[in-house]
Amino acid sequence: MLNHIGQIPAAAAFKFSNKDALVFEGRTFSFNEINDLVERAAGGLSDLGIVQGDTVTLYAANSWEWIVSYYAIARLGAVINPVNTMLTPSEIEYVVKDCGAKAIIASPEKVAAI
Protein backbone atom coordinates (compact mmCIF):
# COMPACT_ATOMS: atom_id res chain seq x y z
CA MET A 1 0.00 0.00 0.00
CA LEU A 2 1.25 3.44 -0.89
CA ASN A 3 1.39 6.16 1.74
CA HIS A 4 2.04 9.11 -0.59
CA ILE A 5 2.47 9.94 -4.25
CA GLY A 6 6.25 9.96 -3.99
CA GLN A 7 6.12 6.18 -3.73
CA ILE A 8 4.34 5.69 -7.05
CA PRO A 9 7.46 5.42 -9.28
CA ALA A 10 9.07 2.75 -7.07
CA ALA A 11 5.85 0.74 -6.84
CA ALA A 12 5.34 0.98 -10.60
CA ALA A 13 8.96 -0.04 -11.26
CA PHE A 14 8.51 -3.07 -9.02
CA LYS A 15 5.34 -4.10 -10.83
CA PHE A 16 6.14 -3.15 -14.44
CA SER A 17 9.99 -2.84 -14.49
CA ASN A 18 11.10 -2.58 -18.12
CA LYS A 19 7.73 -1.82 -19.68
CA ASP A 20 7.26 1.60 -21.24
CA ALA A 21 6.19 4.19 -18.69
CA LEU A 22 6.58 7.45 -20.59
CA VAL A 23 7.14 8.59 -24.14
CA PHE A 24 8.10 12.23 -24.56
CA GLU A 25 9.16 13.77 -27.86
CA GLY A 26 10.25 10.41 -29.25
CA ARG A 27 12.17 9.33 -26.15
CA THR A 28 10.86 6.30 -24.26
CA PHE A 29 11.44 5.63 -20.56
CA SER A 30 10.76 2.38 -18.74
CA PHE A 31 9.27 2.33 -15.26
CA ASN A 32 12.72 1.35 -13.93
CA GLU A 33 14.35 4.29 -15.71
CA ILE A 34 11.80 6.76 -14.36
CA ASN A 35 12.25 5.40 -10.84
CA ASP A 36 16.06 5.60 -11.13
CA LEU A 37 15.85 9.21 -12.33
CA VAL A 38 13.47 10.08 -9.49
CA GLU A 39 15.85 8.47 -6.97
CA ARG A 40 18.81 10.45 -8.32
CA ALA A 41 16.89 13.72 -8.35
CA ALA A 42 15.56 13.12 -4.83
CA GLY A 43 19.12 12.41 -3.70
CA GLY A 44 20.29 15.68 -5.22
CA LEU A 45 17.52 17.61 -3.49
CA SER A 46 18.34 15.88 -0.23
CA ASP A 47 22.02 16.82 -0.66
CA LEU A 48 20.86 20.43 -0.98
CA GLY A 49 19.11 20.15 2.38
CA ILE A 50 15.53 19.60 1.23
CA VAL A 51 13.61 17.61 3.83
CA GLN A 52 10.04 16.55 4.51
CA GLY A 53 7.75 19.55 4.81
CA ASP A 54 9.97 21.95 2.84
CA THR A 55 8.36 23.62 -0.17
CA VAL A 56 10.02 23.30 -3.56
CA THR A 57 8.81 25.39 -6.49
CA LEU A 58 8.67 23.60 -9.83
CA TYR A 59 8.85 26.12 -12.67
CA ALA A 60 9.30 24.35 -15.97
CA ALA A 61 7.60 23.61 -19.25
CA ASN A 62 6.02 20.20 -19.81
CA SER A 63 8.84 17.68 -20.10
CA TRP A 64 10.05 14.36 -18.78
CA GLU A 65 12.26 16.35 -16.39
CA TRP A 66 9.14 17.99 -14.93
CA ILE A 67 7.66 14.58 -14.17
CA VAL A 68 10.89 13.34 -12.59
CA SER A 69 11.22 16.52 -10.51
CA TYR A 70 7.59 16.30 -9.36
CA TYR A 71 8.03 12.76 -8.06
CA ALA A 72 11.49 13.52 -6.60
CA ILE A 73 10.05 16.34 -4.51
CA ALA A 74 7.20 14.10 -3.41
CA ARG A 75 9.55 11.21 -2.63
CA LEU A 76 11.21 13.39 0.02
CA GLY A 77 7.85 14.33 1.50
CA ALA A 78 8.38 17.92 0.46
CA VAL A 79 5.57 20.16 -0.74
CA ILE A 80 5.35 20.57 -4.52
CA ASN A 81 4.61 24.12 -5.66
CA PRO A 82 4.05 23.91 -9.43
CA VAL A 83 4.06 27.36 -11.03
CA ASN A 84 2.27 28.29 -14.24
CA THR A 85 4.91 29.05 -16.86
CA MET A 86 2.74 31.86 -18.26
CA LEU A 87 3.14 34.04 -15.15
CA THR A 88 5.12 37.27 -15.29
CA PRO A 89 8.38 37.57 -13.34
CA SER A 90 6.68 39.65 -10.64
CA GLU A 91 3.90 37.07 -10.29
CA ILE A 92 6.48 34.29 -10.01
CA GLU A 93 8.32 36.25 -7.33
CA TYR A 94 5.10 36.65 -5.36
CA VAL A 95 4.20 32.95 -5.60
CA VAL A 96 7.69 31.80 -4.56
CA LYS A 97 7.87 34.19 -1.61
CA ASP A 98 4.29 33.53 -0.52
CA CYS A 99 4.77 29.76 -0.34
CA GLY A 100 8.14 30.05 1.41
CA ALA A 101 9.95 27.88 -1.13
CA LYS A 102 13.27 26.58 0.08
CA ALA A 103 14.34 25.73 -3.49
CA ILE A 104 13.28 26.26 -7.09
CA ILE A 105 13.63 23.75 -9.89
CA ALA A 106 13.43 25.57 -13.22
CA SER A 107 13.97 24.51 -16.79
CA PRO A 108 16.83 26.32 -18.57
CA GLU A 109 14.51 28.48 -20.67
CA LYS A 110 12.68 29.68 -17.54
CA VAL A 111 15.68 30.58 -15.37
CA ALA A 112 15.91 34.16 -16.67
CA ALA A 113 12.39 34.88 -15.41
CA ILE A 114 13.38 34.12 -11.85
Each predicted region: which residue ranges?
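Aromatic/hydrophobic pocket-lining residues that form π-stacking "cages" and hydrophobic walls in ligand
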Residues: P9, V68-S69, I114
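Structural core segment of the AMP-binding/adenylate-forming
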Residues: D47-L48, R75-I114
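Conserved donor sugar-nucleotide recognition element shared by glycan-biosynthetic enzymes
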Residues: I5
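Conserved AMP-binding/adenylate-forming core of the ANL superfamily
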Residues: L2, N18-S63, I67-Y71, T88-E93
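A generic, residue-level signal for flexible/boundary positions that often mark functional hotspots
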Residues: F16, V23, G77-N81
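Flexible acidic/glycine-rich loop/turn elements at helix↔coil and beta-strand↔loop transitions
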Residues: A11-S17
